[in-house]
A protein has these predicted regions:
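Alpha-helical transmembrane segments and adjacent TM-loop junctions that form the membrane-embedded core
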Residues: 1-23
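Soluble cytosolic regulatory domains appended to membrane proteins
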Residues: 23-216
């Protein structure tokens, strides 16, 4: 909450300036950017604040595809999996929210589960419950949707995770609240459990390794 509060305030301010499509905006994004730069030069804004506001102004130009964790490296769970099976899978332990896919088609994400909810059910000895019993609905966006739209929807719905799909509805990646905040700050938020900081780079490396294996 402490981290996101100033971002929410600035985001709402900038959104308010440009939200009306019926009325001509009195100030353009370029003018706001120029004013912020002048403010930074005169000491009104610190360098980090200037950078953050500039990033906020660019959110409409950044797509989900640019910041998402690609599906090829995302950890997802099958809906028929029991809570016992889920808990035994170490790959899920570092994530608080895990997308759940249809058992007949892993390109179709049905929702997500909260790790905390699973731990609570396990504490009640409900080991044989399935993920489908506790699944939650998840927000979905197109690969081409901009980050500003994703940010506003996540805030409005009080959600922290969203699924990115292509034009056919197939799973292409994940964008979290953390991803959007990192984009705003212009820096990566590294958790103590994070092992890979650039998931898109990891996806490229994984694809290259698969191609090399196929050509042997």
């Amino acid at each position: 909450v402490i981290i996101t509060y100033p971002l929410v305030i600035m985001s709402e301010f900038i959104t308010h300036i440009f939200s009306s499509k019926k009325q001509q905006a009195s100030v353009s994004r370029e003018e706001v950017s120029a004013m912020v730069n002048v403010g930074a030069e005169e000491g009104v804004f610190e360098k980090k604040e200037n950078s953050m506001i500039q990033n906020l102004l660019k959110l409409d130009d950044i797509s989900a595809r640019d910041i998402m964790t690609p599906s090829s490296v995302a950890e997802i769970a099958e809906e028929s999996m029991t809570l016992r099976e889920f808990y035994r899978n170490e790959a899920f332990r570092q994530f608080s929210r895990i997308p759940v896919y249809n058992e007949e088609n892993d390109d179709y994400i049905k929702g997500y589960v909260l790790r905390q909810a699973i731990l609570e059910k396990l504490a009640e000895d409900k080991f044989d419950l399935r993920l489908s019993d506790i699944i939650r609905p998840v927000l979905t966006f197109q690969e081409t949707d901009n980050v500003s739209k994703i940010w506003e929807r996540l805030l409005a719905k009080k959600e922290h995770i969203s699924i990115i799909i292509d034009e056919y509805g197939c799973f292409r990646g994940i964008v979290t609240m953390e991803d959007v905040i990192e984009t705003m700050l212009g820096t990566e938020i590294v958790d103590e459990k994070d092992r890979v900081t650039d998931m898109q780079e990891l996806a490229r490396e994984k694809w290259q390794q698969e191609q090399q294996q196929n050509h042997k």
